[in-house]
Amino acid sequence: HPRMDLPIWTPATTLVPHRVLACAPVSETPKSAPGGKSEDSAPNFVDELVQAEIDAGRTRLVMRFPPEPNGYLHIGHAKSIITNFSLAQKLPGAHCNLRFDDTNPANEDTEFVESIQEDVRWLGFEWGEHRYFASDYFQQLYDMAIRLIVAGKAYVDSQSLEAIRDGRGSFHQAGVASPFRDRSVDENLALFRRMRAGEFDEGAHVLRAKIDMASKDLKLRDPVMYRILKVPHHRTGTEWPMYPMYDWAHGQSDAIEGVTHSICTLEFQNHRGLYDWFQEQLGVVDPPRQIEFARLNLTYTVLSKRSLQKLVAAGHVSGWDDPRMPTVAGLRRRGVSPDAIRAFCDRVGVAKRDSFVDVTLLEHAIREDLNATSPRLMGVLRPLRVVIENYPEDAEESFDLALNPGDEAAGSRAVPFCRELFVDQEDFMEVPAPKFWRLFPGNEVRLRGACLLTVNRVVKN
């Protein structure tokens, strides 16, 4: 810009122009524009399953995204958000719940609740009135547990957690029944109510489902439903001295909310038997269908929430939203748009088997989106003065440059032009390196939108 008050760095160069008024602007056309499905979208088997149900007459569709508020969401969660909320758009009247599975108060905080809500909205989705917490259902879950105790399907175990683990057996060996497995219903009810009243220390008792200690499915070998944990909850305070385990709270929360499809990642595939068992014992009408899909694994990228927490706690990064982090907040600070993330997830697809996705696919989606949406602006970081010797000293004109050559609606901007300009020092070499095609003595280059220049001489201070 000829009128900018910039420092003049040496060396200075003097250049001779050619055909100043006859030069055409250089344009760039992006490969594609954002929005809608990409031409190279990958298969989505969950979408196909749900669509088949709709085609067969399903009239009700309730999805849910159930994060635990113990950290910031990363790009793997973004895939789950997009999958669930997009499915809820397939049927009029359908919706997707945002439910916080807040059953482990030791690691949860309202900061994470707020950040998760911000990320979901930023990705372009709304839950409306359908925001819930597992803690909303603590009393209902407790009452359901009482029903299982009365039905002889749950009991209070007074073994240590270590003894319970050892008694589970293995894939090749049946489990060992707890010596407290055959307690009477009355004794179990009395102990469970005393657990609720806070009369016992942590580790004194747990409530276990009474299923089958010889089952080939280890999850069905009398899993723990409740443990004593005297830690204040971010919503309920000290009201509850015990908390439900994930496998107990999750499925029943789905049922309470009327969820039709519980979409989760493959690590929960071996939880499905227990998920269904609880629903059957409680007599849930039209129980949710659990469907598992492959989680997102990116090359050269850590997506373990526990590992990311260590980076934050140790001060290796400035926070969960550090631009180097693979969190949604970090990507947002890096300048990534929600359209780019949605396009990336669309190309990855939803598969049944775990695999690694090359991180270059994410980078390509980001570049493609930026190319289609970013205005073309120019700046000089390390200025080098250019004097156009055969241009009138007192003349000044302007050239119109497209803000985005691939998007006419983006408009244009006027770029001033005069005898003295500034280019970046990186664009000039007095002795050019191999394959250097920018400014050097005797070489001809084009100024974007303006003219051709040839370096005539170099003047040094």
At which residue positions do the language-model features occur?
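Conserved short loop/turn motifs at secondary-structure junctions
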Residues: 66-71, 99-107, 129-139, 162, ...
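N-terminal catalytic cores of NTP/NDP-binding nucleotidyl/phosphoryl-transfer enzymes
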Residues: 41-51, 55-117, 234-265
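Active-site cores that bind ATP or allylic diphosphates and position pyrophosphate for catalysis
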Residues: 98, 102-104, 110, 147-308, ...
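Extended, domain-scale alpha-helical bundle/helix-rich regions
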Residues: 319-412
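A glycine-rich helix N-cap at a beta->alpha junction
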Residues: 112-135, 154
